[in-house]
């Protein structure tokens, strides 16, 4: 059993756990575990008012998993960062959209339209004032990039 985690997470774990099967996994690095390639993508807030949640300096990550040529991206808590927008050949993206911690519906649709996965699964879409409007997300995304298919899952 192997756990990949940023060093900042490992440092917060009890020593008996941290020294076991946890490998440091920082933004920009790639690791192979059991034939699956994991690439860490920086996950952070861009908006000044959101810096207290996920500043880039904290080292939070999203992950691209490559399993036999199928690429799946998990955004983590992030806005549409340059690193996210530069992703290529993503088959399925699992992207968070909940203000104030990540992105709103419009920003999420713009980010997804830019890196253009085949399928997008919205998650973590509860906001402080209820739920993000998934219908609006789908409408905006369809206008920007009709080639991306939205799959809704029961997240909450």
Label the model's feature ranges.
Residues 1-37:
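Active-site HxH/HxHxD metal-binding segment of metal-dependent hydrolases
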Residues 1-2, 15-20, 68-69, 88-91, ...:
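Short glycine/proline-enriched coil/turn segments at helix->beta-strand junctions
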Residues 13-17, 32-37, 50-51, 102-109, ...:
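Short, charged, surface-exposed secondary-structure boundary motifs
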Residues 13-14, 84, 137:
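Hydrophobic packing residues within well-ordered alpha-helices of enzyme cores
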Residues 17-29, 109, 113, 118-156:
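Binuclear metal-ion centers of metallo-dependent hydrolases, dominated by the metallo-beta-lactamase
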Residues 24-88, 153-156:
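Core dinuclear metal-dependent hydrolase active-site scaffold
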């Amino acid at each position: 059993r192997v756990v990949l985690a940023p060093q900042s997470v490992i440092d917060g774990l009890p020593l008996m756990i941290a020294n076991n099967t946890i490998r440091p996994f920082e933004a920009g690095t790639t690791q192979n575990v059991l034939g699956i390639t994991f690439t860490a993508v920086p996950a952070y807030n861009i908006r000044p008012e959101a810096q207290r949640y996920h500043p880039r300096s904290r080292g939070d990550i999203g992950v691209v998993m490559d399993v036999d040529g199928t690429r799946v991206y998990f955004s983590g808590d992030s806005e549409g960062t340059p690193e996210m927008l530069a992703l290529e050949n993503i088959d399925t993206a699992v992207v968070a959209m909940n203000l104030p911690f990540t992105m709103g519906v419009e920003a999420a649709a713009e980010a997804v339209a830019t890196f253009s996965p085949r399928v997008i699964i919205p998650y973590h879409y509860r906001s402080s004032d209820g739920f993000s409007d998934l219908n609006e997300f789908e409408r905006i995304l369809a206008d920007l990039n009709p080639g991306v298919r939205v799959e809704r899952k029961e997240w909450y």
